[in-house]
Amino acid sequence: MKLKTSKELVQEAMDKIKTITPAELKNLKIKNPDAILIDIRDIRELKKTGKIKGAIHMPRGMLEFWLDPESPYYKKDISPEKTKIFYCASNWRSALATQAIQNMGFENVCHVKGGFQAIVDEGFEIEKI
């Protein structure tokens, strides 16, 4: 049995999802201020670096449960219709997260190339948690 590597899984996801640059994120947030920016990093990462101002923290392990209306963990305040933009530290986990919710049926989803630091380098503010 040949197992797929994490790198292969990420590449498969990248081939099926939309990736935007931090500059495109800036334009998207201007054109669509209701778009939800979602940080899927571990809470320890957020405590160390903070998060992008205005982003929602949604731990990767809870993603599918928080977005599933039939789950006891469903978060009603995260509208299924709103555009969702995921980021992590680099862009591997966010690629997998984007593919997962796309597989759930969500349509307006993407992730940010380069992750947290690339977004910060584009001029986005950080807020401590």
Residue map of PLM features:
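Active-site flanking residues adjacent to catalytic metal/cofactor-binding acidic residues
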Residues: I38
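Rhodanese-like catalytic fold shared by cysteine-dependent sulfurtransferases
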Residues: M1-A35, I43-K84, W92-I129
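Short, surface-exposed ligand- or partner-binding patches at beta-edge/loop junctions that are enriched
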Residues: Y87
